[in-house]
């Protein structure tokens, strides 16, 4: 069997037989090894393109490429905004761009397995989270199959008046994840992307002084009607009417 393919299998199965959070707690592998694993994941992504990929447009490809560079900032800012009425023409452009990226995702390979995300979360939200709660991300959610990549995104504390804490997510992807590694300008990130309003059920939480480790699994919105839900960005409880609007948009 090809050595590079074996490395990829090792990468994708990193936590198959390990304890929760083992992979993300391990010392980082060498830059050379991480780069090679990312390249292998990119190759796998390209090889996994199915019949839907034949319908992807040049505009959609360009949108995904731009998303990985800077487009994610505008798209996610718009999706997380509580009031978009003041966006004007920029709002219309953002909505069109978001639709284009979502359309592209539906034509890119699905990924099922484990991925990781490093970020900063409001301490007020972290303090009330329990296993079984569901986190709803109103924006696109970026993850990586490489824990080393995920950890890079939680190094620098954001400039925010809110009290934040570093969080490392271990994500069991059952649905909704699409690899953009074959198109992304940052293919070394081995990125798996979720469309807006992805739902993640908390399966395990481990709190330390420096980090909070959270294990989650992807779930359908329709499967968590009677579950405590929180907006991952704002930290606010997702009310039933708001939850319904997320499902129906």
Swiss-Prot record:
InterPro entries: ADP-ribosyltransferase (IPR003540)
Catalytic activity: L-arginyl-[protein] + NAD(+) = N(omega)-(ADP-D-ribosyl)-L-arginyl-[protein] + nicotinamide + H(+)
GO cellular component assignments: extracellular region
Main location class: secreted
Signal peptide region: 1-18
Gene3D superfamilies: Toxin ADP-ribosyltransferase, Chain A, domain 1
Active site: 117, 142, 191
Family classification: Belongs to the Arg-specific ADP-ribosyltransferase family.
The protein's Enzyme Commission number: 2.4.2.31
Subcellular compartments: Secreted
Entry keyword set: Glycosyltransferase, NAD, NADP, Nucleotide-binding, Nucleotidyltransferase, Secreted, Signal, Toxin, Transferase, Virulence
Pfam families attached to this UniProt entry: ADPrib_exo_Tox
Function: A probable mono(ADP-ribosyl)transferase, it may ADP-ribosylate Arg in target protein(s). Upon expression in yeast cells causes cell death.
UniProt-annotated binding residues for NAD(+): 68-80, 117-120, 137, 191
Record protein name field: Putative NAD(+)--arginine ADP-ribosyltransferase Vis
């Amino acid at each position: 069997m090809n050595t590079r393919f074996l490395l990829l299998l090792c990468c994708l199965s990193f936590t198959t037989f390990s304890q929760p959070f083992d992979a993300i707690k391990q010392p980082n592998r060498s830059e050379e090894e991480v780069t090679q694993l990312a390249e292998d994941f990119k190759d796998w992504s390209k090889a996994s393109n199915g019949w839907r990929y034949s319908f992807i447009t040049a505009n959609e490809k360009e949108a995904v490429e731009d998303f990985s560079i800077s487009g994610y900032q505008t798209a996610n800012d718009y999706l997380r905004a509580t009031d978009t009425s003041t966006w004007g023409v920029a709002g219309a452009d953002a909505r069109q761009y978001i639709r284009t990226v979502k359309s592209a995702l539906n034509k890119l390979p699905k990924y099922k397995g484990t991925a990781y995300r490093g970020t900063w979360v409001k301490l007020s939200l972290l303090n009330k989270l329990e296993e079984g709660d569901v986190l709803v991300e109103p924006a696109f959610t970026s993850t990586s199959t490489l824990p080393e990549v995920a950890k890079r995104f939680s190094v620098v504390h954001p400039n925010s008046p809110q009290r934040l804490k570093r969080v490392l997510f271990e994500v069991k992807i059952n649905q909704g994840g699409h690899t953009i590694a074959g198109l992304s300008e940052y293919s070394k990130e081995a990125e798996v992307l979720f469309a807006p309003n992805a739902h993640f059920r908390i399966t395990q939480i481990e709190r330390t002084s420096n980090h909070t480790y959270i294990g989650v699994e992807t779930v359908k919105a329709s499967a968590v009607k009677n579950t405590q839900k929180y907006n991952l960005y704002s930290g606010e409880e997702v009310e039933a009417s708001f939850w319904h609007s997320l499902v129906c948009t």
